[in-house]
């Protein structure tokens, strides 16, 4: 047993300068586990609710109430628990909150405790977190889905699509994939400078130039891939996160200033897929446009990965609905959307059992916490989205994956092209 002896929490800052919750758990053998909770800018309406103070401090975004929930309400209930009983502990946290969306205690309070307990238990067992959570079969290093051009809610620009990403599918190892991404990222900066475009960074480390339209972003990325010495679609593919809920108004999608129906937007995506080496479309339609999603999946699901983020919010009930109604073929996994470690693992397992792919994801407001890197390997997810190879809160996750690959040594496998149906020759699920 590794008995929980004490729990503490504090208010710290995330990468956007907003407060977030950090939790420390002390075990009876002296082991300390620490975890910090991320926060999103583009959030789904059905996510677990983070608790904010709503007072004059930090523009209402303080988290003293969540910190107090940890120390005054959660700690007395779980001190004395065996930290290795993660599922029992997480169930107790859910029961203690008593709401369907964790709004009483706050998902930021609950997740902070859940993550810190997992880390403490892993350290107490002298196991890396990925091995503790994933067992002996955890071995697959994920393709880094690098957001190198930002638009939408992540940048002050006139590009509607929120993220333009690169996927180094042709690399043999994660370390090599990271190099592919970094070299392309630097090449993109040179391309932007050469065009007289801004090279300021968005929330997730990607560049945020003012561009005329969304296709220009893809064209610039393809140019950068070539400039870096790589082959588009062979060495490096591209992907987008449209975050379509953000430009959905009164039953229409306002894209590039034009209102479009779901059917018209689907045709737009079909044209993009035909024109570019796209392997993944995330949130291409709004979070409640289930009919549109079904049409899109029927049209493109056999060709490219269609990732549900806002529509699924890492919630097993919504994921199950998607599986039953043939919506999407992949799930974005964010720990703070659901609020505990075990619920996150359950969501991944549910997706994999149904043949859906999974992508473990950061949030736009991040910290130096590297839990998601370990979760990506623990679950053999095959993909991770944690921003550009810039800004230390993003790079921390990549560096952790380098360490994990080194530790796995000959057992390590890089997901590579096999993670995506378009160029792997497999079905999309």
Curated annotation (Swiss-Prot):
One of its GO terms (cellular component) is extracellular region. Its cofactor is Mg(2+). The active site is at residues 204, 334. It catalyses: (2R)-2-phosphoglycerate = phosphoenolpyruvate + H2O. One of its GO terms (molecular function) is magnesium ion binding. SUPFAM superfamilies: Enolase C-terminal domain-like, Enolase N-terminal domain-like. InterPro entries: Enolase, Enolase-like_C_sf, Enolase-like_N, Enolase_C, Enolase_CS, Enolase_N, Mandelate_racemase_C. Mg(2+) binds at residues 241, 282, 309. It comes from the Bacteria. One of its GO terms (biological process) is glycolytic process. The keyword Metal-binding applies. It is found in: Cytoplasm; Secreted; Cell surface. Its EC number is 4.2.1.11. Pathway: Carbohydrate degradation; glycolysis; pyruvate from D-glyceraldehyde 3-phosphate: step 4/5. (2R)-2-phosphoglycerate binds at residues 162, 334, 363-364, 385. It holds the Pfam family Enolase_N. Catalyzes the reversible conversion of 2-phosphoglycerate (2-PG) into phosphoenolpyruvate (PEP). It is essential for the degradation of carbohydrates via glycolysis. Belongs to the enolase family. This is Enolase. It comes from Acidothermus cellulolyticus (strain ATCC 43068 / DSM 8971 / 11B). The gene is eno.
